[in-house]
C-alpha cells in the first residue's frame, strides 16, 4: 500500500517484493501476508512546539511509526534531521521489522523522529525540544509496548534528555529507551555495536568468498563512507584487526588516506563530529597523507578497493559509483547504513555476483548492520533483569548474533533465491544472494508469527 509521495518506502517495498517472487510462486498463500505486512499497525504524527534561546516559539513535526509487533514490542530509533518525513520513517520501520527478526531477539519493528535539526542548536535548545517531543510521545511508548533508541541526530545527549523527560512525566524508571548512559541502565558495547557488528558479519563473508582479503592483513583495503558513530567504530575495528581504512566522508565531501587512517585520526574526527564540525576543517590537523575532496563520495575516488562499507545514509551508492567499485576490484559490499545502495547499484552488485565467484558479494543493511539493534535488545534484557553484563559478555553475544544472522541469510538465499547458476560457474561455487536471504528469512519469520496470532489467514 504505497502512496505516490512515498519514494523511499516504495523502493524498500519493491526490493522485498522482488526478492520474494520465487518463494511466493511456490508458496502463494504468503501473498496475503505480504499485502497485510506492508501496512503499519499504527502511525502517530504530532506537533512539537519548543522555545529557542531568544524566547520565541518554534514548531516541528514529530512522528512514530509503530510498524509491527508480532515478534515483540515495537523497536527502532528516533531520527532528528530536517529531511525526516513519513515516507522515510515508513521505509525505516518496514526494514527494521525484518532486521529485528534476523537478530533472533523478541523485538517488533518501528521508527520515529522529527524534522528538527540539532545542528547549530545550543544544548538548552536541544533539551527543550526533547522535553517537548517526549511530552507527546510518552503516551505511546513503554518497555513492553514500544522501545525507541537513537539514530541520526539522536545521540547520547538526546537520549539522556528524552529519558529524563519520560521519567519525570511518568514518575517511573524503566527501560523504555535504549542507548542509555552506562550508569543509568545502558549497556556496554552499545555505542560500538553497529560498527563492530558490521565487521563481525563481513568477516564471515570474507572467510567464505575471499579469505585472501582477511581483515588481519594490512594489504586489505577498506573504503568506508560517513563519519558518524557507525563509521567511526567500523573504522576503529578494521584498524584494530589490521586492515587499511582508506576513506571517511560527510555531507560536504570525502577525506581520503591512501596509506590508511590511524586510530588517532579517527579519535580526532570523533571529537570534531561531537562538536558538529565538518571533515574539511580537520585536514591540516591530521598532517600529510590525507586529501579532502569537496562534494564527492569516496566510491569513485579510489583506484583499488577490496571491501566497501557504506555507513552514511540511504541511497549513498549510485549506479555509476557501483560500477566504479566493481572496476576497482571490490569483493565485498556490506551496508552499515540503512538501504545505503540504490536499486540500480544493487543490480550492478548482484549481476557481478551471479557472473563470477570473484564478483561483488553484497549484504543489505537489514542483515549486516543489525548489530546495533541486537545490543539494544540485549540492553532491554539487562533492564528487565535489573543487572548489567560485562563488555566481554555483551561482545561475545553480539558476535554470536551476527554469526547466526549471516548463517540464516546464507541458508535462505541458497534455498529460496530461485537463481540459475551462470555459465562457467560450478553449481557448488556460486555465492547465494544475501539480499534475497535476508528478505526471505525476515519475512517468513514475521509472517508466520502474524498467522499464528490471527493477523492473516
Swiss-Prot record:
Keyword Oxidoreductase in annotation: yes
Gene: gdhA
UniProt cross-references to CDD domains, sorted A to Z: NAD_bind_2_Glu_DH (cd05313)
SUBUNIT field: Homohexamer.
Organism of provenance: Agaricus bisporus (White button mushroom)
Stated name of the protein: NADP-specific glutamate dehydrogenase
PROSITE patterns: GLFV_DEHYDROGENASE
Catalytic activity: L-glutamate + NADP(+) + H2O = 2-oxoglutarate + NH4(+) + NADPH + H(+)
Transmembrane parts of this sequence: none
Catalytic residues, chain numbering: 111
Enzyme class name: oxidoreductase
Gene3D superfamilies: Glutamate Dehydrogenase, chain A, domain 3, Leucine Dehydrogenase, chain A, domain 1, NAD(P)-binding Rossmann-like Domain
Amino acid at each position: 500500500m504505497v502512496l505516490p509521495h512515498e519514494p523511499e518506502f516504495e523502493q524498500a517495498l519493491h526490493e522485498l517484493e522482488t526478492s520474494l517472487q520465487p518463494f511466493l510462486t511456490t508458496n502463494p498463500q504468503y501473498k496475503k501476508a505480504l499485502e497485510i505486512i506492508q501496512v503499519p499497525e499504527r502511525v502517530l504524527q504530532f506537533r512539537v512546539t519548543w522555545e529557542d534561546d531568544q524566547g520565541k516559539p518554534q514548531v516541528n513535526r514529530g512522528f512514530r511509526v509503530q510498524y509491527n509487533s508480532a515478534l515483540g514490542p515495537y523497536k527502532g530509533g528516533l531520527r532528528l534531521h530536517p529531511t525526516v518525513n513519513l515516507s522515510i520513517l515508513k521505509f525505516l520501520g518496514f526494514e527494521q521489522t525484518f532486521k529485528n527478526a534476523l537478530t533472533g531477539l523478541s523485538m517488533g519493528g518501528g521508527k520515529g523522529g522529527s524534522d528538527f535539526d540539532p545542528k547549530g542548536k545550543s544544548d538548552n535548545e536541544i533539551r527543550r525540544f526533547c522535553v517537548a517531543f517526549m511530552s507527546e510521545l510518552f503516551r505511546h511508548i513503554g518497555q513492553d509496548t514500544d522501545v525507541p533508541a537513537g539514530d541520526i541526530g539522536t545521540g547520547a545527549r538526546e537520549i539522556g534528555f528524552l529519558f529524563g523527560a519520560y521519567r519525570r512525566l511518568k514518575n517511573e524508571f524503566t527501560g523504555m529507551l535504549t542507548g542509555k548512559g552506562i550508569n543509568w541502565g545502558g549497556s556496554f558495547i552499545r555505542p560500538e555495536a553497529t560498527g563492530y557488528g558490521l565487521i563481525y558479519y563481513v568477516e564471515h563473508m570474507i572467510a567464505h568468498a575471499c579469505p585472501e582479503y582477511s581483515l588481519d592483513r594490512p594489504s586489505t583495503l577498506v573504503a568506508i563512507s560517513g563519519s558518524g558513530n557507525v563509521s567511526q567504530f567500523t573504522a576503529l575495528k578494521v584498524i584494530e584487526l589490521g586492515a587499511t581504512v582508506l576513506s571517511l566522508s560527510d555531507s560536504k565531501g570525502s577525506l581520503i588516506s591512501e596509506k590508511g587512517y590511524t586510530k588517532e585520526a579517527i579519535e580526532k574526527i570523533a571529537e570534531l563530529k561531537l562538536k558538529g564540525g565538518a571533515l574539511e576543517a580537520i585536514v591540516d590537523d591530521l598532517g600529510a597523507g590525507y586529501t579532502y575532496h569537496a562534494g564527492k563520495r569516496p566510491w569513485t575516488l579510489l583506484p583499488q578497493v577490496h571491501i566497501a562499507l557504506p555507513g552514511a545514509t540511504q541511497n549513498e551508492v549510485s549506479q555509476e559509483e557501483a560500477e566504479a567499485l566493481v572496476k576497482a576490484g571490490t569483493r565485498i559490499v556490506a551496508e552499515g547504513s540503512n538501504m545505503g545502495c540504490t536499486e540500480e547499484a544493487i543490480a550492478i552488485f548482484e549481476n557481478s555476483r551471479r557472473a563470477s565467484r570473484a564478483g561483488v558479494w553484497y549484504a543489505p543493511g537489514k542483515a549486516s548492520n543489525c548489530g546495533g539493534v541486537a545490543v539494544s535488545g540485549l540492553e532491554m534484557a539487562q533492564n528487565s533483569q535489573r543487572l548489567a553484563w560485562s563488555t566481554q559478555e555483551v561482545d561475545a553475544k553480539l558476535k554470536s548474533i551476527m554469526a547466526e544472522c549471516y548463517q540464516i541469510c546464507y541458508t535462505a538465499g541458497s534455498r529460496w533465491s530461485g537463481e540459475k547458476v551462470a555459465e562457467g560457474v560450478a553449481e557448488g561455487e556460486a555465492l547465494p544472494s544475501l539480499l534475497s536471504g535476508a528478505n526471505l528469512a525476515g519475512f517468513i519469520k514475521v509472517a508466520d508469527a502474524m498467522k499464528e496470532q490471527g493477523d492473516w489467514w
